């Protein structure tokens, strides 16, 4: 059978933050598939890169007092560390801020221009009058023009999936300053996705998508065949100041990050090809016989199934074989939350001593070929890992290996390996291969655990610990242990794409060559004695989960000193105020607000200027004397409580349109600290507190 040639990518993480477990769903899903393909003997290259360009990187670097290059180099190191820790086996992990990417972006752009698929037109953009800059899509928020969802970015709605231009937003505001943006005109470059050639191509291309949900969504975007196209031209340029690649022949104009990011897949592969002597053009050229797959989150399906394939098709490159989208991750049935400690970073997971293969196994047990969301239930996580991997799988080796090594010098009884149980395990290989190929990992692991149950039943029936007590049953003991360990070897092959480090430990323990799918037809040999058994994996301790949540619960870190102050005695507690009536309380309108922006107030060492979203369709400006307790960066994105009907107050620094509630001790000098009130993460801006 001829080996397949496969190029695989995962979406590129943005170089503006940490890798968290939500990201890891995708990289683990991809890595399992890649490892399986390698075990099948296919020629596979898995490439990735940091997505490094855009205004967010530029502004964060400015805030930190470093260059964008220094920022992206640091974040690249952090991301690579996290991927290595979670055994994500990239053949090359690169950066979109690379010369290969610049060259490819220019080449593709010029090819599209030669095909008359690039056009220029003046567009009216939002401009921040406070920061004196055009606002990129992700630095404008407002209401979706289609579904009305609030707090949506300027390029696409995360609720309904619609894409639009920023000026279509209702009630927009600048995320940078909180100001209401003004409109200014600027010349921009567009990829003519509305061209009939693009529509015709995309209608043909969508027919081959593997996921029905993706095909249906694309049909929705394309509209009914025979009707006028619903495709819009794509703005591929941004104005200076911008961190990215300048467009050839257009000073002060830069490629939009969403143009150069997917091209970064090819740039990473080109870098790998040059290092390994791979024929790059043979893999990505229009007549390539290689396969190309992109694993992505369902939120970026639009870019990968419309813009990217059309861009490739008309610039002289091959198009993707398929795009595989996955759903979002929830933790204990809810969105990841910093206040609950469930916004778990990859680094915090490993720093607290958690085994990355526990998470790899759990995610695999939940993943399938659909775009449905998956939930990390922490109680189930502990139970499943401890039951499946330790109680069932590892238990087989621990119950058989000791007897084989002590009584038989580690040598198996090869004649005993004709046992029907082993044939049962081998017969499952084609079905398991089909599950892995189809990304039906949950089905694969259910079948593996069924086989594991059968092996444990064999061990329980033969009771090697009882056979070992009777010398006359030495042959039966030898056979039982030999069959058990050969079964363990086969199960390890089936689990290796998911838990590669543990599989490597099994290979050393069983004294076998690295296991691939072809090894299913082999067996343990008496010529290569099994080594003394060593623990392959420890159980998950609930205390580790508690420590992990605590490490990620940032709001509790600030609350700890307050708790200590409270314990100091009644003198630290301010007396309760005079009694009021329910009518008095009803006059105060307390609302949940989201802090969308925060800045220090020049000339004040106490005040912070907060831009708040109360769900009114516009933002409010509030000054709060909490600078001693928080930096602006700590507050952006948090929910808090505001007195919404407090009369606006004109202050030296501007108008304050409400009051943020915060807690403090009666004697702030003796017990310093201010702590804003943070509602439950399920609350939304505008909810009234009663």
UniProtKB/Swiss-Prot annotation:
Its EC number is 6.1.1.10. The keyword ATP-binding applies. InterPro entries: aa-tRNA-synth_I_CS, Anticodon_Met, Met-tRNA-synth_bsu_C, Met-tRNA_ligase_1, Met-tRNA_synth, Methionyl/Leucyl_tRNA_Synth, MetRS_core, MetRS_Zn. A motif ('KMSKS' region) lies at residues 335-339. Its cofactor is Zn(2+). Keywords: Aminoacyl-tRNA synthetase, ATP-binding, Cytoplasm, Ligase, Metal-binding, Nucleotide-binding, Protein biosynthesis, RNA-binding, tRNA-binding, Zinc. One of its GO terms (biological process) is methionyl-tRNA aminoacylation. Binds 1 zinc ion per subunit. ATP binds at residue 338. It catalyses: tRNA(Met) + L-methionine + ATP = L-methionyl-tRNA(Met) + AMP + diphosphate. A motif ('HIGH' region) lies at residues 13-23. Zn(2+) binds at residues 144, 147, 157, 160. Pfam families: Anticodon_3, tRNA-synt_1g, tRNA_bind. Disulfide bonds: none annotated. GO terms for cellular component: cytosol. It is found in: Cytoplasm. Residues 584-690 form the tRNA-binding domain. Its main location: cytoplasm. GO terms for molecular function: ATP binding; metal ion binding; methionine-tRNA ligase activity; tRNA binding. Belongs to the class-I aminoacyl-tRNA synthetase family. MetG type 1 subfamily. Homodimer. Is required not only for elongation of protein synthesis but also for the initiation of all mRNA translation through initiator tRNA(fMet) aminoacylation. This is Methionine--tRNA ligase. It comes from Cupriavidus metallidurans (strain ATCC 43123 / DSM 2839 / NBRC 102507 / CH34).
